[in-house]
């Protein structure tokens, strides 16, 4: 009997220790999720706008249930409100969303090669973050990848915090690069219409967050575009941006990456759903100039071309094709998308839609 008591006590202590350990692991995990999904937005280097708490998500197939999407988007196509060209109704008026608000910025750096890249949602941000993590710590990245066979999300989160800067000044101070001499500063840009459609199908159709997603419009694109335009306009007027998971995917590209002050320093790389074409050529041109060995470029090429269809890719789905056609065939909806993203077209040198 005397021998059993110590064993029982030892077992109880073991169970308690394990419970405490698992509790700490879960707390760490939830902290990680919160940090990963809730970014703050700065209108200056010090003042952060409040963040929206993480919500439950509902998933919807992009390949089935097309009858539901068609039923929710059966409203009559309306004519344009404003006539003339976009330049005529956007310049020096309040019809279009003003440029250069200071939305969240995330620079990923590879200091060994003096490379900094500003990531933007719906412009290959997940894949690019993984590549810059590889360039930041190649040995650890490859070792962990071999052990875990990491997904795109694993690769994106592996270095987060270690090679990420929210402000360009912090990056410059860390690496003594006030003038960014010898550094490459890059950003992937995307056609505003293509980016909007991708964001809409991904955030409002494929996965909807919270009890009233996408401005309470459910899956009706007309409702969402008109209400999102009004949201943009009010926030731009107040100079205070809200921080929702949806907003990060729709805010104009020119609100990111210190474009107002650093545009001339950037090397802009155009997004392509087929990364083996122009995008890879532009990226590799920069990489070779910065001294990245061919062996590492082979790894990057593999990352850009294999399994390019990440979990949030919407290309080629019936839902994507339906909403793209719906937008392009609606004069009113196209007008309001142009009003929201006019300055992206101009600043990033993309052609405006026909008729604008």
UniProtKB/Swiss-Prot annotation:
Record's bilayer topology term: Single-pass membrane protein
Predominant place of localization: membrane
Compartment(s) of residence: Membrane
Entry's Gene Ontology BP terms: positive regulation of response to oxidative stress
Annotated Pfam families: Sulfotransfer_2
InterPro entries given in the database record: Chst-1-like, Sulfotransferase
One of the record's GO molecular function terms: chondroitin 4-sulfotransferase activity
Entry keyword set: Membrane, Transmembrane, Transmembrane helix
One Gene Ontology cellular component annotation held by this UniProt entry: membrane
Transmembrane segment boundaries: 8-28
Protein family according to the UniProt entry: To C.elegans C41C4.1 and C18B2.1.
Name of the molecule in the record: Uncharacterized protein C18B2.2
Organism expressing this protein natively: Caenorhabditis elegans
């Amino acid at each position: 009997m005397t021998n059993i008591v110590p064993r029982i006590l030892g077992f109880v202590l073991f169970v308690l220790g394990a419970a405490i350990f698992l509790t700490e692991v879960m707390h760490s995990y939830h902290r990680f999720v919160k940090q990963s999904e809730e970014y703050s937005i700065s209108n200056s280097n010090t003042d952060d706008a409040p963040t929206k708490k993480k919500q439950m998500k509902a998933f919807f197939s992009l390949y089935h249930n097309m009858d539901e999407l068609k039923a929710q988007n059966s409203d009559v196509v309306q004519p344009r409100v404003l006539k003339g060209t976009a330049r005529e109704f956007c310049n020096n008026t309040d019809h279009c969303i003003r440029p250069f608000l200071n939305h969240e910025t995330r620079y990923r750096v590879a200091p060994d090669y003096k490379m900094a890249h500003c990531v933007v949602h719906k412009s290959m941000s997940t894949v690019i973050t993984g590549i810059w993590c590889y360039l930041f710590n190649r040995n650890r990245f490859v070792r962990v990848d071999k052990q875990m066979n990491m997904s795109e999300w694993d690769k994106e989160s592996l270095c987060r915090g270690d090679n990420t800067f929210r402000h360009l000044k912090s990056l410059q101070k860390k690496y003594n690069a006030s003038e960014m001499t010898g550094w490459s500063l890059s950003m992937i840009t995307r056609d505003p219409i293509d980016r909007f459609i991708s964001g809409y199908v991904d955030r409002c159709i494929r996965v909807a967050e919270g009890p009233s997603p996408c401005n309470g419009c459910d899956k009706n694109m007309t409702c969402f575009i008109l209400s999102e335009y009004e949201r943009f306009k009010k926030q731009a007027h107040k100079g205070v941006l809200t921080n929702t998971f949806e907003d990060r995917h729709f805010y104009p590209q020119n609100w990111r990456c210190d474009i107002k002050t650093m545009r001339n320093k950037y090397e802009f790389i155009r997004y392509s759903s087929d990364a083996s074409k122009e995008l890879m050529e532009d990226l590799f041109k920069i990489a070779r100039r910065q001294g990245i060995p061919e062996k590492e470029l082979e790894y990057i090429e593999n990352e850009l071309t294999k399994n390019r269809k990440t979990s949030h890719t919407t290309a080629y789905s019936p839902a994507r094709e339906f909403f793209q056609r719906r937008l392009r065939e609606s004069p009113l909806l196209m007008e309001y998308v142009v009003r929201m993203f006019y300055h992206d077209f101009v600043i990033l040198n993309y052609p405006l839609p026909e008729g604008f």
